[in-house]
A protein has these predicted regions:
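M16 family metallopeptidases and their MPP-like homologs
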Residues: 18-30, 36-38, 55-111, 148-170, ...
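Compact, aliphatic and Gly/Pro-tolerant "microcore" segments centered on a short helix or tight beta-hairpin
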Residues: 124-189
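Acidic/histidine-enriched alpha-helical segments
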Residues: 59, 115-139, 227-233, 333-358
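Short, low-order "capping/linker" segments at domain edges
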Residues: 137-141, 238-250, 352-362
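Short amphipathic beta-strand starts and helix->beta connectors
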Residues: 66-71, 174-186, 237, 291-298, ...
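His/Glu-rich zincin catalytic helix
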Residues: 1-66, 171-174, 184-287, 324, ...
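Short, flexible, solvent-exposed loop/turn segments with mixed acidic/basic and small polar residues
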Residues: 75-76, 84, 183-191, 299-303, ...
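Short, polar/flexible loop-turn hinges at active-site or ligand-entry regions and domain interfaces
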Residues: 48-51, 93-96, 115-124
């Protein structure tokens, strides 16, 4: 439902949970220059505001609302970057008063958005500096993790788009360059220029919600967003080797595929990836790790919104070429149809089970609705989605596998 140009509210009625959930999402274009600013905004939104200017008073106010929880997160989809504020609170039936919490919770959200902890067009320095340091520490700790580091470096190598080279929370050097002024100005831009989607998950009075949201100064905005990205195939594989002090080496491979969300072969791609390396029954795991002992860990994953499929393997440095040949061999076997019907059927069962389990999470419902709004008929109901998975044949999997092509190879070489 449109509130203004570029501003929408989405009702997701459900009695599945004891809580109601409000998700306020701001989505802008993915840009290397703004990722760190937006990550800092998400930190500040979950820390304090003018009405509750300390971390302690902020938490106490949430506690007074019968333990209402506030969290923020950032995410990317194609060439877009989103910042979410999520408020979760008890439904009226569980509150020992007749008034309920809706108005107070939405009022608190409004304070976070329109009364941020600021002075003279910038965030209050003391709290901002703490949150900036917290984010930098978080990023530094992540970078010390060899698997995370290899993933980041693998994507830097694979992508040509500068925004996609940067993790969704930014990089420490990008965060370091931001100030209380630059982050605050970005926040003001987000409020007035980003696409805004407000998700109401649970039991809500639609009229009451619309009445409340019209009190927010949400003006119309025009924004052109690209939720899908497709990188052209090149016939030269980019390679990089980087030594790092570690007892283990990591092989990070980037493959390109030509499919987008909702395409006919999207479902075959899901099945292929699950069979190739996503789960513990996959050919990479059972063959390279369990049977041949070439990898401590190995897995694959793909992002339908950027056209990237990744394989990582934690290995001994001396096993690099052997592991590379093993991964290529297993991919070729799938291309040639050298896998059993029982493996295909087992894969479908696991995908089905995981999809049904994910329905228990409110965020899954939010993403399903968002995809429906963005992609229209390409986004299917769970029932239809499962039907499409079930229709995938061996021939479909082989066809998709033949379109998965290696584009980058990053090797984190462990040295003592």
């Amino acid at each position: 439902m449109k509130i203004a140009d570029g501003v929408y509210v989405h009702f997701i009625p459900t009695q599945k949970y004891k809580t109601n959930r409000i998700v306020f999402r701001m989505t802008g274009s993915l840009n290397k220059q703004t990722i760190a600013k937006r990550a800092l905004v998400s930190q500040m939104l979950a820390t304090a505001n003018q009405m509750y200017p300390t971390v302690q008073s902020f938490k106490e106010r949430l506690a007074s609302l019968y333990g209402t929880q506030l969290s923020t997160r950032v995410s990317t989809k194609g060439l877009t970057h989103s910042v979410d504020i999520e408020l979760t609170y008890l439904k009226d039936a569980l509150i020992p008063t007749n008034e309920g919490l809706f108005w107070e919770v939405l009022g608190f959200l409004k304070e976070c958005l329109y009364k941020p902890l600021s002075r003279v067009a910038q965030y209050q320095n003391k709290v901002f500096d703490i949150e900036k340091q917290n984010l930098m520490t978080y990023l530094d700790v992540d970078t010390e993790n060899n698997y995370y580091y290899s993933e980041v470096k693998g994507r830097e190598l694979y992508f040509v788009n500068e925004g996609l080279k940067v993790p969704k929370y930014g990089q420490a050097e990008l965060v370091e360059a931001e100030t209380s002024f630059t982050a605050y100005q970005e926040f003001q831009s987000m409020l007035t220029r980003d696409r805004i989607d407000i998700f109401m998950v649970g039991e809500f009075d639609d009229y009451q919600v619309l009445q409340a949201l019209h009190r927010f100064p949400l003006e119309g905005r025009q924004i052109d967003l690209q939720f899908s990205y497709s990188q052209p195939y090149v016939n030269v594989v980019k390679e990089k080797i980087e030594p790092r002090q570690s007892s283990q080496s990591i092989l990070q491979l980037g493959y390109q595929f030509p499919y987008q969300y909702g395409d006919k072969d999207y479902f075959a791609l899901i099945v292929f990836n699950a069979m190739f390396g996503e789960f513990a029954h996959s050919v990479l795991f059972t063959t390279l790790r369990e049977k041949e002992g070439l990898a401590y860990s190995i897995s694959s994953q793909f992002d339908i919104f950027t056209g990237l499929l990744e394989v990582y393997a934690g290995i001994e440095k001396s096993n690099r070429n052997q592991a590379m040949r093993g991964i290529s061999r297993e991919l070729n076997y799938i291309k040639l149809g050298r896998f059993s019907s029982s493996l295909l059927n087992q894969t479908k069962k696991i995908i089905r089970m995981n999809a049904l389990l994910s329905e228990d999470h409110a965020l899954t419902l939010v993403e399903q609705r968002f995809n429906k709004v963005i992609f229209g008929d390409k986004s299917l109901s769970l029932e239809n989605w499962l039907d499409e998975i079930e229709k995938v044949t061996k021939k479909d999997v082989c066809r998709v596998a033949r379109q998965v092509k290696l584009q980058s190879l990053f090797f984190l070489e462990g040295v003592s």
